[in-house]
Regions:
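Charged, glycine-enriched surface loops/patches
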Residues: 153-182, 205-215
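Catalytic His-Asp segment of secreted/periplasmic serine-dependent ester chemistry enzymes
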Residues: 184-266
Length: 266
């Protein structure tokens, strides 16, 4: 085509050259445009991929009694330790401590010692409203407690205790959360033998329930017992008041919880 155009008069040749030059410029601009579009698309794709690769922040609720709640004399309860350990491991997380002292699993209508909201009363607000990925359930000490001494009824009967925990587990699962059941921690020798015997029934029930409901389990009796056998002070060193774990006990529990979450979060 170019040869045919150049056979004409000089004026036409000039016009032809201008046309060819303009076409060349337009072609160059078009190529630059395509290159720019490709670059933008690549950036968008890389950004999308990068966002997809970012780890989701886990929401963890620790639901329980005074062995979960912040407590005077404890530097870091296990909820705090969980957050720190997961953060250090590169797992974004938010830990909500929903432990309340003297709580049992039931309602204040079931047993009003003390007259506060108990597990069933506050479950919706304290747990489900946070849409948790993980929930730890740590009850039993107050449920099993016999206010009138040896041979008398527990605050929450064993069957009701199991039913309450089952309700918590079912509702958490319905809301796409995962459950870690903790047995109540053991008692030290400061507490009467009959209290150990009654609490053991509740501990055994938690172990059985975790198996039947296919949820994670931390056997605090086993964890604390192993530590007590290897360290001076034994169980009394873990729980000076006979009931509530000090910082070492909270660290033991936190380590077990973190181990489970890290394993399941891969």
């Amino acid at each position: 085509m170019e040869e045919l155009l150049f056979r004409h008069s000089p004026e036409k040749q000039i016009i032809a050259k201008l046309i060819l030059s303009k076409a060349s410029i337009m072609r160059t601009k078009y190529m630059h445009f395509l290159s720019s579009v490709s670059t933008v698309l690549l950036i968008v794709l890389l950004s999308t991929f990068s966002s997809a690769q970012e780890k989701k922040e886990l929401t963890i609720v620790t639901f329980g009694n005074s062995t979960t709640a912040p407590r005077k004399g404890i530097e870091k309860v296990y909820a705090v330790r969980i957050h720190e350990a997961l953060t250090e491991a590169g797992i974004p997380n938010k830990v909500i401590n929903s432990g309340v002292g003297s709580n049992h699993t039931g309602s204040v209508k079931d047993n009003d010692r003390p007259k506060i909201e108990h597990g069933m009363d506050r479950f919706e607000k304290a747990v489900l409203s946070h849409h948790p990925d993980w929930v730890t359930l740590n009850f039993g000490l107050n449920d099993a407690y016999q206010d009138k001494g040896d041979g008398t009824a527990s605050r929450i009967p064993l069957e009701a205790f199991i039913a309450n925990l089952t309700h918590f587990i079912t509702e958490i699962k319905k809301n796409n959360g995962r459950v870690i059941l903790l047995t109540p921690n053991p008692l030290s020798s400061k507490l009467e033998p009959f209290r150990h015997e009654r609490l053991k029934l509740y501990k055994d029930a938690v172990i059985k329930l975790a198996k039947s409901e296919h949820v994670e389990l931390i056997n605090s009796w086993k964890v604390f017992g192993k530590y007590a056998r290897k360290n001076p002070g034994g169980m009394e060193g873990l729980m000076p008041d006979g009931l509530h774990p000090m910082d070492t006990g909270h660290k033991l529990i936190a380590d077990e919880i973190v181990k489970i979450i890290k394993k399941r979060n891969r």
